[in-house]
């Protein structure tokens, strides 16, 4: 169920909806704080022992996803470019490149753990 307000989420949950999908960025565009609204919905469900799960949607950046995960909202529908923002990190990329280079120095260029013969 597409959700824009906490009361709408509460009513959907009382009617038996399995999931309520607050559209975070669209809520922001309506002049409200989409992250806060989503957290309020999560709290309403928990405080009222409702089985409906929050399925957050419509993100504009990876920080929004991370903030909701830190709050305990782990279900989300996320665009590929936002997912890339969650996993892309230059320090990690550099470390992986260094590990690969070190491994290839020991085993030969293009070798991986799956195609390296120990014997």
Predicted regions located by residue number:
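Short His-Asn-centered micro-motif
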Residues: 1-2, 57
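Glycine-rich phosphate-binding active-site loops on the catalytic face of alpha/beta enzymes
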Residues: 2-3, 16-30, 72-92
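Catalytic cores of alpha/beta
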Residues: 5-15, 60-75
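Phosphate/pyrophosphate-binding betaalpha-module
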Residues: 6, 11-14, 18-23, 28-45
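Conserved active-site and cofactor/substrate-binding residues in soluble primary-metabolism enzymes
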Residues: 32, 36, 60-63, 94
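Alpha-helix-loop-beta-strand connector modules within alpha/beta enzyme cores
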Residues: 35-54, 98-113
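Shared catalytic-loop signature of beta/alpha-barrel
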Residues: 45, 53-69, 77-87
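Flexible C-terminal active-site loop/helix
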Residues: 77-119
